């Protein structure tokens, strides 16, 4: 009889912290890559709009499409399909991410949510005030909601490139802040950028919203079922005078965020089922039904919201948002007078994004920390807080979206606003990155929360 082999040491269990952080790591990697794709599409749109192909570029997105179902018919441009149709899916994912953070994520308790909420309020109020200081009393004042948003894809992309100098807690803080920014932007779109409210259609929309709530309470897990009701809600809101993309947000908030069965109970069932399979004769093949049952038990751990986000997020990050950037970032600078490039609308928008976000977020956060309302995320220095506050001034996707609602397509005001959005976002990203680059490296980083580039509202 040979010598007894020593029992290998047991591998320690994965810390709970690592298990919680891994989904956030995946989210951050996805957003970082999406930022690169978004930037490429924005540059391509600007290049096309200022090239000999500018007429073809505009004509392509003005292409008229049509749909007919029996006696019902509709015509719309390709730009409308992107802005009103595909962006509904974008806002659907935004709605789900908001619900996930509020239900099981970083914003699930008041203490966790308080600091990013205060920072977000400052980061929305100060930019709006600066914008109105430049444009009050003019037709451009309608775009006061433009500089309120933070583009999470670009923002996290910049922070990812500087991961050695940004504490992970500060990245989580900025992500939570952007979630509140999204909520603010959604409320602004719903309340201030509608047109001619029609109570009959809004009543129908209310009924469909109640249907979504009932589906959530009944734990409906079919994405197709939610899509069908959301399409009807989109139609009702469109005719009711509220921007139809809000249907995506409402649907996203209705998706169940928790598993129906507790993960512990599911895992216990999986363990028992696996033990039964292992007790079977070794020469007995596992039939497909047994394997399928095991897969179904494992699927019960994931909530419908988690499953839908996992399925749709790559499409939003790498298809819908880049197509939106390609359709909406093109500004023919040759058609604008020099005075318009440095006019009140363009400069007001750029300053509102850069200075407004920087001052609003930094001051509100600093006051909240100094007053003992909440601790500084990761014990970050004032310089690091200044850096991330500046980076949060990158407002792109939702800012362009609100500008389109405020000024309408193809107008000179819209082009001036786009110049301001692009300039303000560029300055915010560059200045924020330079400030963070000059700060000391983070002394100790756990491997779990590391940000690495592997990318959406």
From Swiss-Prot:
HAMAP family: NhaA
GO BP terms: regulation of pH
Source organism: Anaeromyxobacter sp. (strain Fw109-5)
Protein name per its UniProtKB record: Na(+)/H(+) antiporter NhaA
Pfam families, per the entry: Na_H_antiport_1 (PF06965)
Topology in the lipid bilayer: Multi-pass membrane protein
Coiled-coil region(s): none
Cleavable signal peptide: none
Keywords, sorted A to Z: Antiport, Cell inner membrane, Cell membrane, Ion transport, Membrane, Sodium, Sodium transport, Transmembrane, Transmembrane helix, Transport
Gene Ontology, cellular component aspect: plasma membrane
Transmembrane segments: 33-53, 76-96, 114-134, 142-162, 172-192, 196-216, 235-255, 308-328, 349-369, 385-405, 419-439
Its biological purpose: Na(+)/H(+) antiporter that extrudes sodium in exchange for external protons.
Subcellular location: Cell inner membrane
A GO MF term: sodium:proton antiporter activity
Reactions listed under catalytic activity: Na(+)(in) + 2 H(+)(out) = Na(+)(out) + 2 H(+)(in)
Entry-linked NCBIfam families: NhaA
Family of this protein: Belongs to the NhaA Na(+)/H(+) (TC 2.A.33) antiporter family.
